[in-house]
Amino acid sequence: MAAAAAAAAAATNGTGGSSGMEVDAAVVPSVMASGVTGSVSVALHPLVILNISDHWIRMRSQEGRPVQVIGALIGKQEGRNIEVMNSFELLSHTVEEKIIIDKEYYYTKEEQFKQVFKELEFLGWYTTGGPPDPSDIHVHKQVCEIIESPLFLKLNPMTKHTDLPVSVFESVIDIINGEATMLFAELTYTLATEEAERIGVDHVARMTATGSGENSTVAEHLIAQHSAIKMLHSRVKLILEYVKASEAGEVPFNHEILREAYALCHCLPVLSTDKFKTDFYDQCNDVGLMAYLGTITKTCNTMNQFVNKFNVLYDRQGIGRRMRGLFF
């Protein structure tokens, strides 16, 4: 994610960029079309790259190894101009070493996104890995059942190049050995950023460039607070150990030190006032309410999925009963 964010930030300073993941001789010839010019113009937002990087890093942390992730691309299309603005994750499973997309999950997520982003539409899909291969063709054919002429974006998180490791493709049909074969044609793209995206990407790039956050005001403030709290903890621990040792007779009493410790304790704010209790209980109630609402939302989502599956099963059984009624 660091490399992708830094490269995206660098690319936003220019007028545009083409794909950084070059297709070389290692690509299987049967999946790439040669001499084909792209039919659409693609504008890619950095938010999509950050989402894909975050998706891949989370799955790698969960699995303990690099894994391939799959998701959907959403945005706007006006004629031959396509703007990829956001993305969301997709579920998939492997059957006989072939990736199968969970279309039911996709339709659920699409409905949810339509409620929030009514102006955005499904444009294609993304995955991670090296150059395109036949397995990508297999997944692309499944996406073609959902939308006609989808885009295919591939990010290589393991690359060591300084260019943006992202390539965008479209599918074309070519006649090979007398048979119609689906191939990929690489598209050039530009990076389109909004002000909020530009600020966020610049912040991430600054944080990841040095690894210490020296250029981030927020990071410097948090580091200073952490150092102060750590020092306070060590000093309080030292005073507590001295008082315990004095009570146990391990060290002689020093009345001056004990008076200073006593005065320090009395400098602490009184936390037993009615106003503090009221504010404290209000904050606890707010936190508990937020957690409760999150649980309710999750439960509603689970119930919604259950109802959808029940309706699908009920419709299938109803069709079966009607078909049997035609023959008996």
Swiss-Prot record:
Pfam families to which the protein is assigned, alphabetical: JAB, MitMem_reg
PROSITE patterns registered for this protein in UniProt: MPN
Compartments, as annotated in UniProt: Cytoplasm; Nucleus
One biological process term in Gene Ontology: protein deneddylation
Family matches, as InterPro entries: EIF3F/CSN6-like_C, JAMM/MPN+_dom, MPN, MPN_CSN6
Gene3D superfamilies: Cytidine Deaminase, domain 2 (3.40.140.10)
Gene Ontology molecular function: any one: metallopeptidase activity
GO CC terms in record: COP9 signalosome; cytoplasm
Key words of the record: Cytoplasm, Nucleus, Signalosome
Predominant subcellular localization, coarse grouping: cytoplasm
Top-level lineage group: Eukaryota
All residue ranges annotated as the MPN domain in the record: 42-175
Quaternary structure (record): Component of the CSN complex, composed of COPS1/GPS1, COPS2, COPS3, COPS4, COPS5, COPS6, COPS7 (COPS7A or COPS7B), COPS8 and COPS9. In the complex, it probably interacts directly with COPS2, COPS4, COPS5, COPS7 (COPS7A or COPS7B) and COPS9. Interacts with the translation initiation factor EIF3S6. Interacts weakly with RBX1. Directly interacts with COP1 and 14-3-3 protein sigma/SFN. Interacts with ERCC6.
Role this protein plays: Component of the COP9 signalosome complex (CSN), a complex involved in various cellular and developmental processes. The CSN complex is an essential regulator of the ubiquitin (Ubl) conjugation pathway by mediating the deneddylation of the cullin subunits of SCF-type E3 ligase complexes, leading to decrease the Ubl ligase activity of SCF-type complexes such as SCF, CSA or DDB2. The complex is also involved in phosphorylation of p53/TP53, c-jun/JUN, IkappaBalpha/NFKBIA, ITPK1 and IRF8, possibly via its association with CK2 and PKD kinases.
Family: Belongs to the peptidase M67A family. CSN6 subfamily.
Name of this protein: COP9 signalosome complex subunit 6
Native organism: Pongo abelii
Gene this protein is translated from: COPS6
